[in-house]
């Protein structure tokens, strides 16, 4: 399932949660059994991934539940300077946060609705998915 989604939507605004491998330290996943994977469609990030040998570990430049920063200065302010490094590539091209899909269980779950809608995920997989967010909070394209 993860491969089907990755082939269809990457690079792009889709985060796929998969079961973490045993060798992945729990500090990377916050103690959770799943890990979110994403390949964004942003040239600077894609080049950084390439220069790092194919993968990097990171989080978004925001606190959970808050909007993502749109600039390096805003990220520093939001995170109270508690970061080791910021790569300032100019204003963020981001808009709506990525769609998050969890493929760790028997049924695929959409954890957050983003630019990719549930019907697009179902079409790519050829099976129904469970939408966890309340429908009233779903933003349409």
Q: In which residue ranges do the predicted regions lie?
A:
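Active-site-adjacent structural elements in enzyme catalytic cores
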Residues: 1-141
């Amino acid at each position: 399932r993860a491969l089907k989604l990755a082939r269809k939507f990457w690079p792009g605004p889709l985060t796929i949660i998969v079961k973490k491998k045993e060798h992945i330290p729990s500090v990377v996943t916050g103690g959770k059994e799943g890990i979110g994977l994403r390949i964004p469609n942003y040239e600077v990030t894609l080049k950084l991934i390439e220069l790092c040998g194919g993968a990097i570990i990171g989080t978004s430049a925001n606190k959970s539940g808050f909007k993502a920063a749109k600039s390096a200065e805003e990220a520093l302010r939001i995170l109270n300077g508690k970061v080791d490094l910021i790569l300032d590539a100019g204003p963020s091209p981001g808009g709506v946060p990525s769609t998050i899909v969890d493929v760790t269980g028997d049924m695929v779950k959409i954890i957050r609705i983003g630019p990719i809608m549930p019907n697009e995920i179902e079409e790519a997989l050829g099976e129904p998915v469970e939408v966890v967010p309340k429908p009233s909070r779903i933003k349409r394209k």
